[in-house]
Amino acid sequence: MSSKEVKTALKSARDAIRNKEYKEALKHCKTVLKQEKNNYNAWVFIGVAAAELEQPDQAQGAYKKAAELEPEQLLAWQGLASLYEKCNQVNAKDDLPGVYQKLLDLYESADRQKWCDVCKKLVALYHQEKKHLEVARTWHRLIKTRQEDGADRQELYELWRKLSQLLAENIEDQNNETQQMLLTAFENALDLADNIPSEDHQVLYRNFIQCLSKFPHETTKLKKACEEMIAIYPTVQYPLEVICLYLIDSGSLTSEGHQYCCKLVEMNSKSGPGLIGLGIIALQDKKYEDAVRHLTEGLKESPVCIAGWCHLAEAQVKMHRPKEAILSCNQALKTIDNFGASGGNLHQKNLCLRLKAEALLKLSDGASSEEAVRTLDQVSDVDNTPGLLVLQGLACLNTGAVDKATKIMEDLVTSYPDLAEAHALEGRVHFTKKDYVQAEVSFQRALEKDAEVAEYHYQLGLTYWFMGEETRKDKTKALTHFLKAARLDAHMGKVFCYLGHYYRDVAGDRNRARGCYRKAFELDDNDAESGAAAVDLSLELEDTETALAILTAVTQKASAGAAKWAWLRRGLYHLKAGQHSQAVADLQAALRADPKDCNCWESLGEAYLSRGGYTTALKSFMKASELNPDSTYSVFKVAAIQQILGRYSEAIAQYQLIIKMKEDYVPALKGLGECHLLLGKVALVDFLDGKAVDYVEQALGYFTRALQHRADVSCLWKLVGDACTCLHPVSPSKVHVHVLGALLGQKEGQEVLKKEELLSLGGRCYGRALKLMSTSNTWCDLGINYYRQVQHLAETGSSMSDLTELLEKSLHCLKKAVRLDSNNHLHWNALGVVACYRGVGNYALAQHCFIKSIQAEQINAAAWTNLGVLYLATENIEQAHEAFKMAQSLDPSYLLCWIGQALIAERVGSYDTMDLFRHTTELSMHTEGAIGYAYWVCTTLQDKSNRETELYQYNILEMNAIPAAQGVLCKYVERIQNSASAFTMLGYLNEHLQLKKEAAEAYQRATTLLHSAEDQNTYNVAVRNWGRLLCSIGDYDRAIQAFKSTPLVELEDIIGFALALFMKGLYKESGSAYERALAVCKSEQDKAHILTAMAIVEYKQGKMDAAKSFLFKCSILKEPTAESLQALCALGLAMRDATLSKAALNELLKHIKRRNDYHSCLLMSAIYALQGHSVAVQRQVAKAVHSNPADPALWSLLSRIVAQYTQRSAKGGAVAGNVAHILDLNHGKKALLYTAVNQLAMGSSTAEDKSNTALKTIQKAAFLSPDDPAVWAGLMAACHADDKLALLNNTQPKRVDLYLALRSAVAASLKDKEILQNYNQSLEKWSFSQVVTGLIDTGKTSEAESLCTQSLKSNPDQPAVILLLRQVQCMSLLESQKPLPDAVLEELQKTVMSNSTSVPAWQWLAQVYQSQGMMGAAEMCYRKSLQVASQQGNWSGKLSSLLKLALLALEVCMANVSGDHWSSLVQEATSEALKVCFSPLAVFLQALLQFNRKMGARETRRLLERIVYQTGYPSSIVSAARWYLLRHLYAKDDPELIDVLVRNAETHGDKRILELNRKLSAQ
């Protein structure tokens, strides 16, 4: 290609680029390059086209190639620069500065404007990359070029200003050359500025000063710049702030600096630098308050001023505010750490650390001193600075390191003998060692070196304060130095504290002392000692306002748990002022500060007590007592509060603790006496008179001991009088009180006082109290005492003349009490009561007194009641009713007004009488209310005709009247023991409650009281009642004697006598007595009863015909009684004459309304049982239950019948027993036993139900009926069954050692039970067999054998015991697995034959034969047991025999013995068992037979799956069936069914099957 063609191609390429046909341009360029490889323009065009086509690498290569070819040509470099500017690649940015430099070189001579543009681009690039030096140099070159080009002043100003802006960032990272160029830029810009002053110029100056402030070496320029700016802009704060901060940091605040600060503060009162500067100047002038104020305010505005914090800390240390100083130092150190450690900062840091250590040492506590040591360790070059070594020594002293402090002190004194601080430290060391003489010398040396240090004077004064005896007496030296210290340092609070001590304790000037203490506290509000002393002295000087002001000021700013002294004192102040709630709050705050201050707890207790918070006060005093067990006061207050709260026993225990510490502590003795007296009064209210007497006796003992120490205390004598008088209601026979001789005027010993003597002693003690202090209350108590003496003498039969003098004395005393205090309603009331007494009978005076009492106290139920009694006594019924009604309205719970209303109702014959008396007994116990209620209950009970009335239902049944009346009457006779009618009523009520022994005792007491009475008929009735009850409780001899003591003419006496003879076993005499009664008897019904009784007497003598004859006579009477027909029916049963029994029962059913009642049902069932109809027995009772479902007796009977006759319905029997127990507890006691027996009869199915086991049921029965031998026997059976079940479940039996204990319980329960001897003997035999069986099962054969042998020794003729003995003896032989000799087998056979009616005996013999391999003999024995069970109707025996027979045959089958006999026997026995009842075991045995015949047969699987998957089978049988089914399935190789079976086993937790599955699957 020719050169012309090349030019044409290049032209085409240029045109293509212009037309944006870049690819076309590339083609042309490539064409050119094929001809001329080094064509510059072609390479440039390729670069342009590639760049436009976004192919930067190709473009870069092309431009570089072009630049290489012609480096002095611009096009390639311009293209490369443009490419790099657009490209974001890292290497492009790295290469761009070089490209710009090349362009600068090319443009410098060619185009100055473009040179400037490239230069600015290059600077921007350098600035972006933070190449500050290159920025400075390049921009400086630009300025120089523009200067050469003749740029104007404004342009140059802008260029220098721009340079200052470019370099002002990141000054800290710049080198010295760059920084100098920056300053030059600012200076030139300022010089070239035209608009002065102006906003831009001000900003520029501000930036210049800000820049200078960052250059520590340019302080001169900084100061100059600030001064210049201040001159130009006098109202601008910034330069002033900068120069102030500079002067502050440099520590060169002169008068000039002071002017700057003042000017700054004038311009802005909140200027931080200005205030800090003023604070530092104030500190230099020792104006510490101003310094702290200015510095604190300044640092709020300028918190990063390290020098400010340091100076603030220094000022605070000078003002003895160590805690504040520590905070300031910490803030300074934090700021230093944030700004980094330069040389200046290091100095400031050391200064801060020193100040912090000094402040910490002023706190004086160990923790602060330890921190001071750690702080000093951070100071550099501490070992070479004496001042720091002194601080280190003081820190060691405060932490207890005296030896180390001594070493530091000695080194300092040696190295710096002229250093005052060293000698002061020496003095401190000696002072700590209590070597005050040497301390004095050292402090004097320190003062010689520097006499103007307040601390040295204070320490010397302190040394004199604690020095020897002379100085202690004369503290003038101490005072002198304290005063000098106070003069030198007016902020040293502790010196003013000791000045306060001096003026208070030595000079006795309390006003001046208070002033010193207040000054000390003002200086240091943490000085609790000074504050407390100031408050205490203010209170002593009666300046409560000042004291309260101090306390309030402290408590308001105190944090939680602080200022205990202030809270405590303010609390005590409020307590004294009666402001109890505020006192409580303050004392609680004090306790938050010190929870272990027992005094504080005591004060809080007093505060609670003052506002009536007894419980909280009690807790407070108890806490105080815990903290200080030796504090008598705390324990006493605990006891006193418990006494107030009515916790007398606890109070007594506390008082006893005090008496152990101080035997003669009279308040505790008095408290003990009061508590026992109060307990006695409580016992009197509860009618526990014996207890009351004992408590009063103890109270008198304590009061006497107190009087031995303080006989001059009136209240003690009054309390003795109260104790003697309070027993007035107690029966004289119970009052025998031991009184110490000291109370009776004797020197030693004690006497027993009766009631009369005790009341008289009470009167004398009241008199003694009146001699010491005459009060209206004591006069009233004395008057009441005389009145009680009169009452007692009247009860004992004294004549009225003997009582007159005492009554006059009583009236005189009560009138005296009224005169002394006419507004006391109790005095008027007491006077009215005495005026009513029959020996006085002054009703007008009594009425006047009661009215005066009401006037004195409007709410006065007692006075209204007494007024009502007065009206009732005078037959004014309506007025009495109104008075009682008024009393009721005032106090509905006041008992006596209700008794008054009840008496009125009784008098007028109201139906509400009984209800009112009942209400009185519900309110409280009172003799009148009790006897009234008991009388009306007995009266209602005696009326047999009202049983169906609503009145009877409500008053007797619903209100539970009988036990309620019996309860109150018991209390009545406890106190009033001479009322025969009360004892008779009590006996009658006890009879109704089946409390026969108690009834007999009550009747006996009535008989004794009536023995000498004139009314012989009443006496005979009492004896009759007594005899009847003696007979009921089995005391027949005394019953016979009682009835013999009567004339025996009344029918009731004769039949009672006859019954007693009968029960004693004297049947002939009893029969004669009944004949005598029959002769006297007039009523047909009574005759029938007597004939029935005579028939029973004949029956007892074995005269059946005579008995039948008497009963037939009864039946032919006009009105035969149900009892006689029942007796005839029972006689038929006893004679086993079903026809007679049935005829009698049919006749009986004609005469009774309810055919299905318990007795008729029992008789009918007995007849069916006699006829052998077991199912009919159950049906009869079930029918009766259906007719009377609410009768618990019938449900109980049904449960018993099922257990005895139809065990197959045991589940129903258990349910019936539970129903009986729910309906009625009395029947339910026995029903629980029947329930348990039925549960046992149900077998293991109930045992698997953990919530309903026979064992739990029988345990409940034993708890409710511990005297029933059958219950203990049942418990033995339940334990045995539980142990068997445990073995079945492969667990350890729990009750293996209970059998002998339970047999002992059975034997103990059978003692003295003469009724049903045959039943008892059978029970005892069964229990014996059960014990032996249990011992055999648990492996205790030797004990079982010993038990059997002992039983046979006492009675050899016991076939059952012999059988048990042979079973025990055979155990060891069978365990040896040796064949038994024929002789042994023959002996065993004989033993079983002697027990041929025993099913278990034949089964046991069969098991013996089976163990010997004698299967035929075993089969014969099982068949024999089956025969015996069938003959006896023994359902369970029959079932067990069949199952055991089937098991025997199956064992033979599984031994693969040939023949069909045994397999057919299995089938036959199990089929018969299933006919008896559904038996899971029988079904399982059939399945096993099939498994043995054809293991893999489908029938085998069907039978086993029925057991495994159907419900109703016990878990043990199901588990065994799973075992065989799994073997069957593996034999059939059926994995699907195997998985189903394994899942079933997992669900039921059958581990045995899972283990078998693992073994079979591994084979």
Curated annotation (Swiss-Prot):
Its main location: cytoplasm. The modification N-acetylserine is found at S2. GO terms for cellular component: cytosol; euchromatin; nucleoplasm; Ski complex. InterPro entries: Ski3/TTC37 (IPR039226), TPR-like_helical_dom_sf (IPR011990), TPR_rpt (IPR019734). It holds the Pfam family TPR_16. The keyword ATP-binding does not apply. Component of the SKI complex, a multiprotein complex that assists the RNA-degrading exosome during the mRNA decay and quality-control pathways. The SKI complex catalyzes mRNA extraction from 80S ribosomal complexes in the 3'-5' direction and channels mRNA to the cytosolic exosome for degradation. SKI-mediated extraction of mRNA from stalled ribosomes allow binding of the Pelota-HBS1L complex and subsequent ribosome disassembly by ABCE1 for ribosome recycling. In the nucleus, the SKI complex associates with transcriptionally active genes in a manner dependent on PAF1 complex (PAF1C). This is Superkiller complex protein 3. The gene is Skic3.
